[in-house]
Amino acid sequence: MADLDDIKDGKDFRTDQPQKNIPFTLKGCGALDWGMQSRLSRIFNPKTGKTVMLAFDHGYFQGPTTGLERIDINIAPLFEHADVLMCTRGILRSVVPPATNKPVVLRASGANSILAELSNEAVALSMDDAVRLNSCAVAAQVYIGSEYEHQSIKNIIQLVDAGMKVGMPTMAVTGVGKDMVRDQRYFSLATRIAAEMGTQIIKTYYVEKGFERIVAGCPVPIVIAGGKKLPEREALEMCWQAIDQGASGVDMGRNIFQSDHPVAMMKAVQAVVHHNETADRAYELYLSEKQ
């Protein structure tokens, strides 16, 4: 223990320099507590304010779909090229090495399969387990306009309330109700409702007409879903259009792991999201990286 006589009085207090208050600039997240902002800072690159998530949680309702037959062989080599991993707790514990050291968004809704009504989901993860697994956010579907709309919104509310107690962000993932058209009007409704319920991130689909209005009407960051597999050039164009119109990143799965050259595709997507490269430039990068 230090002797009282050994403690020297401080001298360099820089009294001419007031302490700076550094604002947290992620859209709509300035009033959150330190722990939640810290987790969001791991998801969204503080320099660019954007993120490239690698989604491989599809097995929770699709099983071993194409590209996800062996996570350890097909997906693990992609980890280092992603900003964030999105998966289930089962895959995280059984396949993802703890030394991977990537922020994780955990799938927190489920309890149904592709063989049944997908919107009939429940919360499938406790917040205690999310904290135990050192995740940076939890994610759940919200099915506006579906038969089980009410339950999916309740799931989101439950996760938001539990997350606020421990500083864990919640990401709402907009599923499409059977009778709803995938257009700006629908996604404006779905994203706004999810944000009003308190979610800190929204994952939704890009639409060609009016996407900038979806982003403007949503008070928290939007990341786009990759959706079904597209030709690489088209997928990069979708990324560029979304980022150009205000999206805060992408959460892509099939357009990465079902590509013939997934590492090259990851690098091309990173170029669009973090380096403002056009789709043409990113596609040139993809072609050069796949050699």
UniProtKB/Swiss-Prot annotation:
<dbReference type="InterPro" id="IPR041720">
    <property type="entry name" value="FbaB-like"/>
</dbReference>
<keyword id="KW-0963">Cytoplasm</keyword>
<dbReference type="InterPro" id="IPR033673">
    <property type="entry name" value="LsrF"/>
</dbReference>
<comment type="function">
    <text>Involved in the degradation of phospho-AI-2, thereby terminating induction of the lsr operon and closing the AI-2 signaling cycle. Catalyzes the transfer of an acetyl moiety from 3-hydroxy-5-phosphonooxypentane-2,4-dione to CoA to form glycerone phosphate and acetyl-CoA.</text>
</comment>
<keyword id="KW-0808">Transferase</keyword>
<comment type="subunit">
    <text>Homodecamer.</text>
</comment>
<keyword id="KW-0704">Schiff base</keyword>
<dbReference type="InterPro" id="IPR013785">
    <property type="entry name" value="Aldolase_TIM"/>
</dbReference>
<dbReference type="Pfam" id="PF01791">
    <property type="entry name" value="DeoC"/>
</dbReference>
<comment type="similarity">
    <text>Belongs to the DeoC/FbaB aldolase family.</text>
</comment>
<dbReference type="InterPro" id="IPR050456">
    <property type="entry name" value="DeoC/FbaB_aldolase"/>
</dbReference>
<dbReference type="InterPro" id="IPR002915">
    <property type="entry name" value="DeoC/FbaB/LacD_aldolase"/>
</dbReference>
<dbReference type="GO" id="GO:0004332">
    <property type="term" value="F:fructose-bisphosphate aldolase activity"/>
</dbReference>
<protein>
    <recommendedName>
        <fullName>3-hydroxy-5-phosphonooxypentane-2,4-dione thiolase</fullName>
        <ecNumber>2.3.1.245</ecNumber>
    </recommendedName>
</protein>
<dbReference type="GO" id="GO:0005737">
    <property type="term" value="C:cytoplasm"/>
</dbReference>
<dbReference type="GO" id="GO:0016747">
    <property type="term" value="F:acyltransferase activity, transferring groups other than amino-acyl groups"/>
</dbReference>
<feature type="active site" description="Schiff-base intermediate with substrate">
    <location>
        <position position="203"/>
    </location>
</feature>
